[in-house]
Amino acid sequence: MRGNRLVEFPDDFWIPIPLDTNNVTALSPFLVPQDHLGSPTIFYSMSALMFVLFVAGTAINLLTIACTLQYKKLRSHLNYILVNMAVANLIVASTGSSTCFVCFAFKYMVLGPLGCKIEGFTAALGGMVSLWSLAVIAFERWLVICKPLGNFVFKSEHALLCCALTWVCGLCASVPPLVGWSRYIPEGMQCSCGPDWYTTGNKFNNESFVMFLFCFCFAVPFSIIVFCYSQLLFTLKMAAKAQADSASTQKAEKEVTRMVVVMVVAFLVCYVPYASFALWVINNRGQTFDLRLATIPSCVSKASTVYNPVIYVLLNKQFRLCMKKMLGMSADEDEESSTSQSTTEVSKVGPS
């Protein structure tokens, strides 16, 4: 077997396993099925998974956007960021998951080098915007409930500014590989594209880009989420102590605590695989690894287009009620009254 150190690869792909040929073009992920990387069962199973994520992710995020447009009461400035996240998720589902479904079915990157860059960029942009939207959601809730700025009123223009900020952050993280700082290449089983996590010591300066992503797109937003939600929980517990006789306040405090735990865990499930894999590659330069494992971070990230809307939208009683009406399903009167009551309770929380 010949190691990759002895094989010179083109700039548009790299295969991080030993190869038994000098003619790497014959194994190009843009030209031939990658049967040497895994059995057909693995490729077809991944194709089926990507199809499910494409259909479910597209449907749930389109429904979120359509529901917001139809029902005026959902067009609250505090819901702007949820719609912003739905748009970002829709980009990932419609470009990333759909193309992966096709490519895994053919067992190679049928889009070619240019299509790979486009798919990698759009999926990265949508993913980064969604990631920063989670941090903004935490920040907005901290700002509104904990009131660290006193009588500051969070208005529509502030919400729009926060949404715009997520796209600026997303572009800062997704544009560099297009202009020479890292690059977009086929990743994992070579049927999806993303930033080059694999190669080191070359003209693309991948190590510095990976560290930039780890700090700017993982450590910073995660710190924001942990800080804001910990402050929010502290405020709620203080309010619950002050209203110890109020069963509804105690119930609201428990529900919010449970939701915060779910939100933080969901963030970690989505982005820890990418972060840990990138750091492992940097600290184990030149080591080969199982490409099936390298495919996991991309799959988990694309799955977030489904489970994040479930957590942030479908578990929102107001959104859920409107979606039921939009789909012609009977709305539960108890649920509607519960929605109104929970909204009232939340509005009472926080320092006066």
From Swiss-Prot:
Glycans are attached at N23, N206. Disulfide bonds join C116-C193. It is a multi-pass membrane protein. SUPFAM superfamilies: Family A G protein-coupled receptor-like. One of its GO terms (molecular function) is G protein-coupled photoreceptor activity. This is Blue-sensitive opsin. It comes from Oryzias latipes. Residues 332-352 are annotated as: Disordered. Belongs to the G-protein coupled receptor 1 family. Opsin subfamily.
